[in-house]
Every structure is written in structure tokens, then in C-alpha cells.
Amino acid sequence: LQGVVSSLPDPLNKSAMTSLPFRFEIDVPAGAGGLSGDTLKLAAGSVFQAQFQRRHEGGKTIIARGGLALNEPLRMADKGVLLAASADRLDADAWRKALAGNPERRDKASGAAAGSDGFPLSGLALRAGELRMLGQRLNDVTLRAVMEEGGWQARLTSKEATGEIVWRDQ
């Protein structure tokens, strides 16, 4: 991806002068012609990997299971998507903002988005030397979280805070 600029937060932020190998693959089961499902694989150098097993049902594409890895080995969830990340510094607020996208553009594209059931994040394994989250800075952070019925169950350890977190859907 030399010549391409990424304005994503670190560690996927890059200038046009920086080179970053990128790979994109779609594996379709033999004989199915991709009608029932496929596997999507992405990689950006050794920094980022993703893999999603997708089903195609009733005009919708559903992510059945997958994994996202940032400076970690790729692991797939049994159901939903597992995110594993480690970084010296990680700004969760910046990532949340970047992944939310432009609300105006998202509203205009709602017709196209209607065929999707969203991104089924089911688990999180995070390690960071410094984590910025919800306007706070935490150091030497380990965060493990799983989606349970009705919300998230998480365990956080850091220099500043340690404990269990339950985040309920409203």
C-alpha cells in the first residue's frame, strides 16, 4: 500500500511514503459458487489480520464467525467475532470514532446497510502499555471481555484500576 494514506488510529495510521503489504482473499467452497457462503481474509503486513466466515441468506450476508488481530495471532470465535489486540499505545476513543464513520454518510447508505445485521463482536482480548478509553488514560492494561445475553462481562487490570465490569444493553 505504498502511495496510500491511512487516517485510521495507530497502529494502522500511515503516510503515503510508508509501505505496508496488503492481502485480500475470498475463498468460495468448491461447487457452491459462493451462493451459501464464503471466507473473507485480510492482512496488512504483520500488524493486522482478519478472517470472517460468512453466510448468504435471504439477500443478507451474515458473519457467522471470525477474528480480528492487531499485533496478535489471529484467533476465530466459535460464534461472532473475536478481537485480539496488543499495542504500546491504544486510543480506544479514536478507534470508536473511526469505526462509527460519518453519521450523515451512514444515514444516506442505510438502504445498502439494511441487508446487514451489523458486526457481531462477541469477545475482546486487549493488552496495552497505555490505553485511552472513555476520556481516561490507563497504564499496563489487560482487558478481557465476552458478550453475554443482555450485555458485556469484562475483567480489567491496570495500574490505575482493577475489577469486573458488567455493561448492560439498554
Where are the predicted features?
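Membrane-proximal interfacial segments on either side of biological membranes
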Residues: 1-40, 51-170
